[in-house]
A protein has these predicted regions:
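Bacterial N-terminal signal peptides that target proteins for export
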Residues: 1-6
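Catalytic glycan-binding domains that act on GlcNAc-containing polysaccharides
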Residues: 24-181
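Signal peptide cleavage region of secreted peptide precursors
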Residues: 18-22
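Bacterial N-terminal signal peptides
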Residues: 7-17
């Protein structure tokens, strides 16, 4: 119901010139993103906030919000409290050096999402290729680092990274299928 009201509000804002077309496109993905996030967190204020943060970060950095959703789900299961054994933390599992290089506070929920989106965009630009190939390399770089991708000329032979790329591909394809319905 809330998203139906949101749609009417966006329509009014578009008619008055206060909303951009990209915001309307983001709305089309918002129900899918919210459904995926709420599937893990339940229908909650956090799920609604996180959906908006994903849409905002996707718009800001030019990253498909469905891809950001897939990365976040694989990285942290949508938990800001997630901490990896190697020290990555938050929704997007930012490492200390990565967060510092991006100029974000990885313990701040919004900055964590924005930092992850920015880093993913950087990897997408760095490993741009034809279609899925470039995206696969970018996702692998998000996990293993760009140096590993360059060293091996593609996805490195690390079992964790191979599994990670497969997991994100599976989630992302599922979200894209929902968007096509």
């Amino acid at each position: 119901m809330a998203y139906r009201i949101f749609a009417v509000c966006i329509g009014v804002l578009m008619m008055t010139g206060l909303a951009r077309p990209q915001q309307v496109l983001a709305y089309e993905d918002s129900e899918i993103v919210y459904s995926e996030v709420a599937g893990k967190l339940g229908q909650s204020d956090e799920a609604a906030w996180l959906t908006e943060a994903i849409l905002y970060a996707g718009d800001l950095y030019g990253v498909d919000p469905l891809l950001l959703t897939a990365v976040m789900e694989a990285e942290s299961g949508f938990s800001m409290n997630s901490l990896s054994p190697v020290g990555a933390c938050g929704y997007m599992q930012l490492m200390p050096d990565t967060a510092a290089s991006l100029g974000v506070d990885r313990y701040n929920p919004l900055e964590n999402v924005l930092g992850g989106a920015s880093y993913l965009r950087t990897q997408m630009e760095r490993f741009a290729g034809d279609g899925d190939y470039g995206l696969t390399e970018a996702v692998a770089a998000y996990n293993a680092g760009g140096g590993a991708i360059e060293k091996y000329g593609g996805v490195p032979p690390y079992s964790e990274t191979i599994s990670y790329v497969g997991r994100i591909g599976e989630i992302y394809r599922g979200l894209l299928a929902l968007a096509e319905d």
